[in-house]
Design a protein with these regions (language model features):
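Active-site mouth loops of central-metabolism enzymes
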Residues: 3-29, 94-102
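Aromatic/hydrophobic pocket-lining residues that form the small-molecule binding cavity
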Residues: 27, 57, 82, 105
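Glycoside hydrolase catalytic-domain context in secreted enzymes
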Residues: 31-33, 42, 106-111
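Conserved, mostly hydrophobic/aromatic
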Residues: 34, 85
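Glycine-rich, proline-tolerant flexible connector loops at the mouths of alpha/beta enzymes
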Residues: 35-70
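Glycine-enriched alpha-helix->loop->beta-strand junction motifs that scaffold or abut catalytic
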Residues: 38, 87-94
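Catalytic beta/alpha-barrel core
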Residues: 43-49, 70-78, 93-104
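Surface-exposed amphipathic alpha-helices with a cationic face
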Residues: 61-65, 86-87, 109-110
Length: 111
């Protein structure tokens, strides 16, 4: 079984507050607690507005990778954002999910 720690998500109020304040120490503590709990991957979701998502994801990825022993699972409702930030990963990662609505999956898969 592969366990994905999904606590680094800006939709969670306390995490959203830490992200908004760029509280690196708070995020690092969350990374360490999830790894200690047995997570195989660390899910990273900005949970911000589309205008802030790229910069927020880049910051989160940098912070998480600075201390994490585990790879990252990128989480965004925007498939183009996933493609944009995925190259920042220093270890092979995962994409959390891609909606099959409309043309969303076409940027990843050729049918």
């Amino acid at each position: 079984m592969i366990l994905i720690g999904e606590k680094i998500n800006g939709a969670i109020p306390s995490v959203g507050n830490a992200i908004a304040n760029r509280d690196e120490a708070w995020i690092i503590d969350l990374v360490q607690r999830q790894e200690a709990a047995g997570a195989d991957y660390l899910d990273v979701c900005a949970g911000t507005t589309p205008e802030l998502e790229y910069d927020t994801l880049c910051w989160l990825i940098d912070v998480v990778q600075s201390v994490a022993n585990k790879p990252i699972c990128i989480d965004s409702p925007d498939p183009h954002m996933l493609l944009r930030v995925f190259p920042k990963l220093t270890k092979p990662g995962l994409v959390n999910s891609i909606s099959m609505e409309g043309e969303n999956a076409m940027c990843f898969f050729r049918f």
